[in-house]
Amino acid sequence: MEKQYLTVTALTRYIKTKIEYDPHLQSVWLKGEISNFKNHSRGHMYFTLKDENARIAAVMFAGHNRNIKFKPENGMKVLVKGKISVYEASGSYQIYIQDMQPDGVGNLHLAYEQLKVRLEEEGLFSQVYKKAIPPYAKTIGVITSPTGAAIRDIITTIKRRYPIGNVIVFPVLVQGESAAPSIVQAIRTANEMGEIDVLIVGRGGGSIEELWAFNEEMVARAIFKSEIPIISAVGHETDFTIADFVADLRAPTPTAAAELAAPNIIELQEKVLQRTLRLQRAMRELVHKKEEKLQVLQKSYAFRYPRQVYEQKEEQLDRALEQLVLAKERYIDKKVNQLKQLSFYLEKHHPSQKIMQTKVAVETLQKQLQREMQTLLQTKEFAFVRAAQKLEALSPLKVMMRGYGLVYDEEKQVLKSVKDVSLGDAVSVQLQDGILDCSVSGIEERELNNGK
């Protein structure tokens, strides 16, 4: 029988088909620890699930992982549901996850803690960004369910405490998947209106699932971006949501939020009354002081004899005018004298005078230089003539003109003695007008007496 060889692709597809048709492998509940976690830019998640003895590759596509509330991380233990299949390119089997939740910690609780840490690191909870709640808000916006107990408590409290205030309700969903987008849109709408002074965002109590819309990141960022101060009022006093941390002020209950947003009109009336009384008392004291001052003025000399005071002041004015005229004349004379002194100084130190003096000095120096140069030149000329005369007197040519000559040997050395030549040597005799080539035919030696 002839052997049939399978291709790698055919074998891999056969194994994949076997696995995918196994009902036990198409609905698998698995628990393990996440490692090698990667979140692809397209939203898909790739990681490894492992325990103490084994590991399996895992894939969770974006269509499934967008519904999980927490952020998977390396080292996190999870419970997953999925199916087993083969990735043909590598020939490896892996689990394709359809659902995932934390192992040992509630899914929502983990998501809450992760988001809280991340937003706090970004600074969304910082007191630096908290806006002050206006003490006397004219218009109060309320973002909550239009049918719950929270809206009744808020409106009742505001109307009781601050009946002159306006209340605008922005009805929203407060639980379910559509609740968070509904709350975000209401916050944006309130900001766009431009007439809301303060916003109350909240709902009544409930489970963590029912309150979850106020733990969504989009709601937290909408509260942070709001230009209107926001008071959060979610659940009961013990309930804390992400919205509470981001809001400008947290109220333990919706009723407490209304009390923080709306002042007590009775207390305001009492304050107005007290301030009115203080103002009246201050006015009475001021009027009394002015009356006393008026009485003092009425008894004064100026009030009883205004004509005399006027004449005295008129005389003082005349004297002051005379002193002013004299002071003006003295001032003008002083300035005229200063001007004359400055003019004299300027004329004395005018640049033209300095230039003229310098020009005269330069001309004097030039004449002196010319005289000294002329004297030096004459001295040098006289010295040159004397040196030339001495040189001429010592010149061999001058001696030759008197009949003398210079005798040289064959090596052109001057002969100073008959002992320096021998018979037959060639010599040359330099005379005034030429040179004689001679031969020594005889030598006659003489004794010198005193150099003669």
UniProtKB/Swiss-Prot annotation:
GO terms for cellular component: cytoplasm; exodeoxyribonuclease VII complex. The keyword Cytoplasm applies. Its EC number is 3.1.11.6. Keywords: Cytoplasm, Exonuclease, Hydrolase, Nuclease. CDD domains: ExoVII_LU_OBF (cd04489). It holds the Pfam family Exonuc_VII_L. It catalyses: Exonucleolytic cleavage in either 5'- to 3'- or 3'- to 5'-direction to yield nucleoside 5'-phosphates. One of its GO terms (molecular function) is nucleic acid binding. Its main location: cytoplasm. It is found in: Cytoplasm. Bidirectionally degrades single-stranded DNA into large acid-insoluble oligonucleotides, which are then degraded further into small acid-soluble oligonucleotides. NCBIfam families: xseA. Heterooligomer composed of large and small subunits. This is Exodeoxyribonuclease 7 large subunit. It comes from Bacillus cereus (strain ATCC 14579 / DSM 31 / CCUG 7414 / JCM 2152 / NBRC 15305 / NCIMB 9373 / NCTC 2599 / NRRL B-3711). The gene is xseA.
